[in-house]
Amino acid sequence: MTTQQSEVRGRILGPEQGGSAIEAQGLVKIFGDNRAVDGVDLSVPSGCIYALLGPNGAGKTTIINMLTTLLKPDGGNAKVFGHDVVHETQVVRQLISLTGQSAAVDERLSASENLRIFALLLGLSRSEANNRAAELLEEFGLADAANRTLDKFSGGMRRRLDLASSLIVQAPLIFLDEPTSGLDPRTRIQMWESIRRLVSSGSTILLTTQYLDEADQLADRIAVIDRGRVVAEGTPHELKAAIGKATLHLQLADQKDTAEAVRIAQTVLKVKPSTPEPALVTAPMADPDRVTDLLVSLREAKIQLATVSVEEPTLDEVFMALTGDGKQTERGVTEP
């Protein structure tokens, strides 16, 4: 970041505005007869990774486009670090960067040339542009392909370059729209580490994703979006807890003890256990404090356990519970 850009961003942010990166109330966007976004409220604290999770066509990209000043809301309002996205467009744009679902790069140029051009356009000197391009190519594992034209890049390599181009100047607020779409598992994990480093060095991240494991691994908070609305919001743990209790798994050392273990579990836990397979007893943990009593009762009955484990509801279960059957994608809904 140049000295001039740093000074501008420092003046815009101000110490009194550092608590909240995004505040949105009642955001609405209508395309024809379709309310693509229908009264969305968001509150994104500074210095966190915040995920918008939802199926295709849920409205995630439209929300991003309104928050980044690319679309004007038809209702509601939103502020970035206290600055209105409609009335203070130019100020907001100095505080953000956006990586979309398609790369804004020139296939006829090399990776290094693309990054240097972006850097020069952002106000870096020629030497700063060269240095920053080299740093980003190394950061995203593209140094060996620095001089290769993009028409010879794989989809995953292009995705990494697209993210790198958006980080030439690290903005206080970074929007990542499906940042790991099309990447192989190893590259996805590398990208996650890069995203975590951005937050560690001072940025706030708002990302959209369809990958449940990605939201679970990365996000401090998640808003589940379905049919243009926020249907749930919270930490991954809070969302899992909201749809059901954790499940206790008791693997018995001897299968012949199964019936007695079920009887004791039902008596102590006050719930109905199940036996999904021989020598395995499972029960919802309606009252976690009673688990210790159960273990004592099983020991007194001389029932030995091979293993004891507790399983939380998964984010997959949260997603399916909140967005119907988990298979609806609303492909008929077109987001610009």
Language model features with spans:
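Short, surface-exposed acidic/glycine-rich loop or hinge patches that mediate macromolecular interfaces
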Residues: 83-86, 230, 255, 285-288, ...
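ABC transporter nucleotide-binding domains
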Residues: 19-24, 29-226, 231-232
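Preference for bulky hydrophobic residues occupying beta-strand positions
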Residues: 29, 42, 250-252, 283, ...
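ABC transporter nucleotide-binding domain
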Residues: 192-285
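Short phosphate-engaging motifs
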Residues: 88, 214, 257-258, 290, ...
